[in-house]
């Protein structure tokens, strides 16, 4: 797919990997809808990127909020060609620590945002992309998910985070096989350690 002239929804686009991806897409001639919970940072990033970027305050794990983001992308730029799933959180906590067992609420929150939120965006963006006319190569869209090396080599205190990223890895192939019939490519990257606000906040 040609980036130039295409529209991408980037979750977590206000900072870190999401912001870097959005900047790269705009520099390559694409248009981006930044979907992030951090409204001040998201609006500032959209302002930095100029007229080919817009922002929508988004909770990716909430159906109504996610639908609003997809609609905002289509309203702003006329169509949606790609999803770059970068939004996520991390919680460093031992299964049994000095203060007792791992918080079940924390575990559920990490899974809800990282895994359920990613799937929520995939299904809604795929629906929108499915309405596109295919390009010369038969493509209607592309989806890039962000897992982590932790999905394969999780470290001490990463049970929740590794489980959430492992889930992203596991669902990629069945989703890719299903959406291939609609001309939508699906892939997942698994980065190592990067200096992002999420990591520095641990």
Question: What does each model-found stretch correspond to?
Answer:
Residues 94-111:
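Substrate-binding pocket helix/loop in short-chain dehydrogenase/reductase
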Residues 96, 153-159, 181-182:
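Active-site loop immediately N-terminal to the catalytic Tyr-X3-Lys motif
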Residues 39-40, 57-69, 104:
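The beta1-alpha1 cofactor-binding region of Rossmann-like NAD(H)/NADP(H)-dependent oxidoreductases
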Residues 127, 177-178:
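Alpha-helical segment proximal to the catalytic Tyr-Lys
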Residues 2-33, 175:
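Canonical Rossmann dinucleotide-binding motif of NAD(H)/NADP(H)-dependent dehydrogenases/reductases
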Residues 148:
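Residue(s) in the substrate-gating loop at a strand-loop-helix junction
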Residues 122, 164:
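Active-site helix of classical SDR
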């Amino acid at each position: 797919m040609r980036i130039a002239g295409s529209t991408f929804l980037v979750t977590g686009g206000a900072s870190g990997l999401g912001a870097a991806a959005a900047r790269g897409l705009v520099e390559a001639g694409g248009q981006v809808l930044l979907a992030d919970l951090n409204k001040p940072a998201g609006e500032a990033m959209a302002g930095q990127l100029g007229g080919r970027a817009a922002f929508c305050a988004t909770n990716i794990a909430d159906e109504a909020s996610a639908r609003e983001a997809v609609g905002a992308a289509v309203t702003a730029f006329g169509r949606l060609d790609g999803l770059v799933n970068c939004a996520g959180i991390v919680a460093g906590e031992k299964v049994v620590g000095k203060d007792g067992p791992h918080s079940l609420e924390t575990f559920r929150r990490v899974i809800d945002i990282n895994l359920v939120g990613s799937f929520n965006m995939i299904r809604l963006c795929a629906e929108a992309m499915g309405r596109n006319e295919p390009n010369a190569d038969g493509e209607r869209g592309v989806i890039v998910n962000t897992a982590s090396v932790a999905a394969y080599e999780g470290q001490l205190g990463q049970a929740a985070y590794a489980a959430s990223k492992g889930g992203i890895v596991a669902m990629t192939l069945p989703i890719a096989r299903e959406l291939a019939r609609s001309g939508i490519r699906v892939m997942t990257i698994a980065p190592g350690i990067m200096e992002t606000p999420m990591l520095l906040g641990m």
